[in-house]
Amino acid sequence: MLDIARGLEYLHTRKPSVIHRDCKSSNILITSRGVAKITDFGLAKVKESTRSMVRSVVGTVNWQAPELWHPHPKYNHKVDVFSCAMVYWEIMQWHNPNKKYPWEGMNEHAIYDAVGAKKQRCVLNHHTIDRLLSYAPLPRPSVSGLRKLWCPEIVDLVERMWQHDPQDRPTMTEVVHELEHLVRRYR
């Protein structure tokens, strides 16, 4: 988790900065030493200004931030924060063969309606083990089922990274600092 966060932080803090725009598990490779490396920069976008917003839809549906599901999306580095949270969720759910992805089985129109118009999003639902992913209204997903398997600070971090409003998500620098603190605390 920390390697992924450090990789995205590196991209986001360069001058000019880079938004990866397609952070997903299949774009994370693990070296023979167990270090995670981010790959596939085919959709990456150089962001010239810290105040500018990007205006094109890109990425892979299951990892896309809600702000991308609008007719004329405006977004910044926080789309990578949201996607990174989805990768973390996959890591946390690795043991579960029944996990379902947020928009599995939905076409683009249905996704746009759910996320853009109705402001719905994926949530982890602790009421059922067999179906861990369901749809529920904002603002915060329930991740209480994961709290039994993972330290609460990690689950809290993923919840913050998943916020519907990008301004409520941490930066990747903040994510790195929190993960470094947790590594020191739990080692």
Predicted feature locations:
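Conserved activation segment of eukaryotic-like protein kinases, specifically the C-terminal portion
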Residues: 54-68
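Protein kinase catalytic-loop region centered on the HRD/HxD motif
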Residues: 6-18
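Conserved end of the kinase activation segment
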Residues: 68-78
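A conserved short helix/loop substructure at the end of the activation segment
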Residues: 163-174
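Catalytic-loop of the protein kinase fold
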Residues: 15-30
